[in-house]
Amino acid sequence: DEAPDGIEKAYCCIASNARDFARFGKLYLNNGKWNGQQLLDSVFVKKCITPRFEKSPEYGYGWWMHEIKGKKLFYMRGHLGQFVIVIPEDDLIIVRLGHLKGLQTKTDPHSNDLYIYVEEAYNMLAQRDKKNNTSH
C-alpha cells in the first residue's frame, strides 16, 4: 500500500492470519529469538516493550503496555480491532482478528475490548483446566 508520493506506509495495515500474528507475539515474548536463533536484537525488543515517553507510559515502539488483574502485558493493536496480546508471566499470546474496534475513553488509552479479550482468554483456560482435571 503506497502513498501517492511513492512512499511506503510502514506504520500499519498488515494483512495476515491469526497464526502469523501469534508468531510476532512469540518472537517478542522470546526476546527476539525464534527456534533458538536470535532474529531481532534483544536490546531492541526490550526497547519496544518499554515505555518510550514520560507523558505516555503506556506506549513503547509499536507496542502498548498495560496491566490487567495484576498481569503485565504488552500488545499490538490494529485499526480495525486486531490485537496481538502477550502476557509473559503466563507464556500466553492472544490474537484477535476483527473488523470493529472498541472505544477508548478519555481516562484510559486502552480500548475497552482489550479487557474483554484478556478476561475471555483466561475464562477459556480455566474451563480447559477444569475439564482436564475432571477427566483424570
Where are the model-predicted features located?
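Carbohydrate-binding/catalytic loop surfaces
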Residues: E2-A15, H66-G70, H79
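Stable alpha-helical elements in mature extracytoplasmic
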Residues: N17-F21, F44, H110, L114
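Non-transmembrane alpha-helical segments in soluble domains
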Residues: A22-L29, V45-I49, W64, E119
